Every structure is written in C-alpha cells, then in structure tokens.
Amino acid sequence: EDVSCTTQSVNDPSLYSIDEASVEVFESREFRTEIFSDSGISLGPLGLADDRSVLNGELVTTNLVITNEGNVPLQFTVNVQNSWPTQLIEGANEVVNGDMSVNILAGNSLSISVNTIVPLAANKGDSNTMIIRTTLQDSETLINGTRLIIEELASLDTESSGQIEVALGKSSITQ
C-alpha cells in the first residue's frame, strides 16, 4: 500500500512537503481459547482448576470459546480426548466422538459446546479428564482441559405448599 503525506505550514501555505511511503501489513494469525462451565464460569487452566463434580447419567456441557485476534480468517480443527462419549456442537454442525473444523473471521469469536455423558456404570470417585485440542490449520495447537469426578451429591427435594416443622434430631413424614 502506498501512502502519501502532505505537510503544510499554517503561516505560509507555499511552504509544504510531500512524503511518500510504502506500507506492508503483515499477516497476524494470533488466537486464544478459553473454556467455561454451562453456567458461564471460566474453568481456567487444567492444572489449577477445581474438579467438577458430576453424577451418573448426567449430561455435562463445557463451552469452548475460540477468539481470532489476528487480521485474517483462520481455520481450526477441534477435537476432544475423553474416555466418555462426547459431542461437539457449533450452530447446526454436530460431531460425535470426532473432529470438528471451523472458520473464524478476523476479530471474531466462536463458541463450541462440548457435551459429555457420564456413564451410568461409573462408580463414586471415578474421574475423567477431558482434553480439548484446538489446532490452527498447519500451525500451533492450544490445549484446554477439565477434570470430571463422580461424587455423591446430597440433595433434598420437597414438595409442599406450606412449611414442614421438625424438631432437631427427629424425623417427620409428610404426605
């Protein structure tokens, strides 16, 4: 790109100079990735992140956000290494236990949902580390991950239109 710059005196318009330069903009292929829980909480780096408690049969969603910080469109391949079944979803595109290719325009971001089904036969304390690899076409790979661990989560569901009054240490049955 050729650029021309004219500088003129404010006191004497007959004094001026014209400078020309050729400017070349280099291609930038910078990008970043981040993963979030289904409630929008950033999970951070795998080595520092807390384990995510899950239950048998639960569908766990992890959202991968890829941001193209460069100045050219970029093509990526996303894959998940996981011993439990996974599904990648981006818009109308869906891939089960495979790789997904996506294109992202310069300055834009794209979100991919990674669904994992926790096996019904898994035992309390079993864990699975899900590794998400985002590879820029013919270039670098960024790796994100999260660890899912099966835990017993105590919960209490009540259905009553009023209050339930129970003395400390006693039990009560409501119908």
Tell what function each PLM region has.
Residues E1, N93-L120:
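Intrinsically disordered, low-complexity Pro/Gly/Ser/Thr-rich segments with frequent PxxP/GP/PP motifs
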Residues E1-V3, L120-T129:
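Short glycine/proline/serine/threonine-rich loop/turn segments at secondary-structure transition edges
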Residues T67, L88, A122:
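Short aromatic-centered micro-motifs
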